[in-house]
Regions:
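Residues lining hydrophobic/aromatic ligand-binding pockets adjacent to catalytic sites
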Residues: 1-201
Length: 201
């Protein structure tokens, strides 16, 4: 597969601007990671109009519901490094089979065509795309966030992200921090071994 997966937020962009961004970064497939793929305020990004507009540009569309956000944290959540409850809920969700299945679907799409994850939020650090990016980077996949036509950034890991025995963790007492110390993608021997032997994160 292409060793890079992109991310983008449709925000309030006119559809033409959004399509131009995809073209600028040579995106060939969009993986929609919105849990609910519709928008009353931005109807051009509802699922069917978006699918049609992308198809006209030769861009594939894939809704991966299993990667959608808006997950509630468990009462016994160990991921207290995330003070934001929405992100803590998603960190809990990452440990489950449904997320693993969704991630495998994303990797399958990205294995065929240059792919960008898409959600509504303009900036990645306010979106669950950030946590998906953490997972991908630990697995040795480069993630790049599209900001505008001239600015795209390699994922820098979220501040709560840690590496413990080659695995991603958001438990504050486990392992060592990734943010500011490791680059995406993580290329440790432990990370590659975990990726080869275990489909969970």
């Amino acid at each position: 597969m292409d060793s890079t997966i992109w991310t983008i937020g449709h925000s309030t962009h006119p559809l033409e601007t959004f399509l131009a961004l995809l073209a600028r970064y040579q995106v060939e497939a969009v993986a929609d990671v919105r849990r609910f793929p519709g928008s009353r305020r931005q109807p051009q990004y509802a699922q069917e109009p978006l699918r049609s507009a992308l198809a006209e540009q030769g861009i594939g569309y894939h809704w991966i519901e299993a990667l959608g956000g808006r997950r509630r944290p468990r009462p016994d959540s160990p991921n207290i490094a995330w003070r934001n409850t929405s992100f803590r809920g998603y960190a809990d969700y990452i440990a489950g089979k449904e997320f693993a299945d969704g991630l495998n679907e994303l990797l399958e799409v990205a294995g065929r065509r240059g792919t960008s994850m898409m959600c509504a939020e303009a900036v990645w650090w306010r979106c669950h795309r950030a946590l998906i990016a953490d997972v991908l980077c630990v697995r040795g996949i480069k993630v790049v966030h599209i900001m505008d036509e001239t600015h795209a950034v390699v994922h820098p890991y979220t501040s709560p992200a840690r590496i413990a025995q080659g695995r991603l963790s958001y438990v504050a007492t486990e392992g060592e921090p990734l943010a500011g110390k490791r680059r995406c993608p993580l290329q440790t021997r432990q990370a590659r071994t975990a990726d080869n032997n275990d489909s969970s994160v």
